[in-house]
């Protein structure tokens, strides 16, 4: 569960290291984003010769959250950091690699390309 102004680590190789949430997409007054939700982010920290630059406004999908989430089978899922993957307008990832584990809930939201690039699906 992340909200406005939350800093997220970027789990792909686009060149961005950290982003900040500007808006949670999906409803008019939606306050919190969960696994698989799309957010509008601003790049806060980036490497010098990456695909994205500091200050750019992009879309991202949440792949890891520190806040635990309960699944239908009763298990809880919790990660060590809040992380996202930068995406294009057509929901495809901007990068070509995904670092770290990602949640299985992304499959239900239609992010199969992100799951195929991920090292580990939890």
Curated annotation (Swiss-Prot):
Highest classification ranks of the organism: Bacteria, Bacillati, Mycoplasmatota, Mycoplasmoidales, Mycoplasmoidaceae
A Gene Ontology biological process term: translation
GO CC annotation: cytosolic large ribosomal subunit
Signal peptide per UniProt: none
Function (record text): Binds to 23S rRNA. Forms part of two intersubunit bridges in the 70S ribosome.
HAMAP family: Ribosomal_uL14 (MF_01367)
Subunit and interaction comment: Part of the 50S ribosomal subunit. Forms a cluster with proteins L3 and L19. In the 70S ribosome, L14 and L19 interact and together make contacts with the 16S rRNA in bridges B5 and B8.
Pfam families (UniProt xref): Ribosomal_L14 (PF00238)
Record keywords, A-Z: Ribonucleoprotein, Ribosomal protein, RNA-binding, rRNA-binding
GO molecular function, one term: structural constituent of ribosome
Official protein name in the record: Large ribosomal subunit protein uL14
Similarity comment: Belongs to the universal ribosomal protein uL14 family.
Top-rank lineage group of the source organism: Bacteria
